[in-house]
Each structure stands twice: as C-alpha cells, then as structure tokens.
UniProtKB/Swiss-Prot annotation:
Clinical disorder: Spinocerebellar ataxia, autosomal recessive, with axonal neuropathy 3: A form of spinocerebellar ataxia, a clinically and genetically heterogeneous group of cerebellar disorders due to degeneration of the cerebellum with variable involvement of the brainstem and spinal cord. SCAN3 is an autosomal recessive disorder characterized by onset in the first decade of slowly progressive distal muscle weakness and atrophy and distal sensory impairment due to an axonal peripheral neuropathy.
A GO BP annotation: respiratory chain complex IV assembly
Family: Belongs to the hcp beta-lactamase family.
Matching PANTHER family: CYTOCHROME C OXIDASE ASSEMBLY FACTOR 7
Role, per record: Required for assembly of mitochondrial respiratory chain complex I and complex IV.
Name this protein carries in UniProt: Cytochrome c oxidase assembly factor 7
Positions of Sel1-like repeats: 34-66, 68-104, 108-146, 147-183, 184-219
Gene3D superfamilies: Tetratricopeptide repeat domain
Coiled coil (residue ranges): none
Keywords: Acetylation, Disease variant, Mitochondrion, Neurodegeneration, Neuropathy, Repeat
Subunit structure: Interacts with CHCHD4/MIA40 through transient intermolecular disulfide bonds.
Keyword Repeat: yes
Molecular-function annotations in GO: protein-disulfide reductase activity
Amino acid sequence: MAGMVDFQDEEQVKSFLENMEVECNYHCYHEKDPDGCYRLVDYLEGIRKNFDEAAKVLKFNCEENQHSDSCYKLGAYYVTGKGGLTQDLKAAARCFLMACEKPGKKSIAACHNVGLLAHDGQVNEDGQPDLGKARDYYTRACDGGYTSSCFNLSAMFLQGAPGFPKDMDLACKYSMKACDLGHIWACANASRMYKLGDGVDKDEAKAEVLKNRAQQLHKEQQKGVQPLTFG
C-alpha cells in the first residue's frame, strides 16, 4: 500500500524518523506552531532520547509561546535538573504558574504544583510556607478535580497553623471531596470526624459508609500492585 512504512525495514524506519524530525522542526520554528514545538519535544524525548535538546525546545516554547503544557514539563525538568538544566525550584515554580494560568492538559496539575511549592516554602522569599497562596492554588486544582489538592486542603484546615486557623467545616468538605475522588486517607479522616462528631454532627451510619469506602479503595489499590503470576 502506497505511503505505508514497513517497520521491519530498518532503512524505511530510519527515513521515516528523519522525516518526522524535519517535519516537527518545520512546524515549530518555521510555522511558529506551539503544538508543533511540543510534538518536537515528544520526538526528542521518545525517539532520540535527547533530553538536553528537548529542554531547549521547552524553554523556547514556554518563554516565547507561553505554551501551557511545555511550561509544565519545563517546570518538571527544573525540579529534577533534567536535560542539562540546573535544579531550580524557583524557576520550576514560575513555569508551573505560567502553566496554571494558561489552558492546557496539565493546567490543573500545574496549579497543584504551585500550591505544593508555596506550601513547602523553599521557593518563598523568607523560606517559610505561604499557606494563603497554597490554599488558593490547591483550591483551583481541587475545583478542577485534582484529588491530592483536595486532600491537602482538608489537612490544612484540619490541622491549622499560626495565621491559618482550623476550620472543621472546610476540613470535612474537602475530605469528602477527596474521598469521592478516591483518596483513601480522606475517606478515613472523614469517617473519623463523623464517628466522633469532631467539628460535624455525629453520624455513625455515615462514618461506617466512609470507613467501608476507605477499605474498598485500599483493596482496589492492593489488587493494582499484585505481582503477575503464571499458572
């Protein structure tokens, strides 16, 4: 069939991959297509395993084109020092913030990471956690259905901190949302709150339902990590 590549033929595969690289470069740098640049990154990572070059394309596509998913991936590169970049959490935070503010497949995860870095505090000027900023970005991510953000919010309101008072109503609200999204410990925490009447009306029946959900999620998680067996 005309145009089909025989992937058993080494020469055809080599030619196909070379053409793909040329095409990706053309779309990125000649047609100024941000999605084309991101496809070039996929090619460099997945086919060439050239992470240094991928980092350069990501920097270009994030800084020049404000491409959300490129900013997210560049942030991840900065977190680990991948692609020849110097490990830099502040640079990572800036990248995640750009990704959070622009629509993209990774926008919600980027908002969570902004919250996470603000919560950790290393990227802040005083080196201390910025709980207000963490709350704001966790909330954005949680509203987008990001489970870990909902759980982190529940923990923040459950524990409280100087300048960040406890709020058991909100702790319960976010525990329930994280539980609905499948977070085991959120279900367990919500169950305990209802069992003890800790900040909410005591409801042992609801506590039991939540405990059972936590146990079911735990069983499902255990099934997911069972080793393969051959009989």
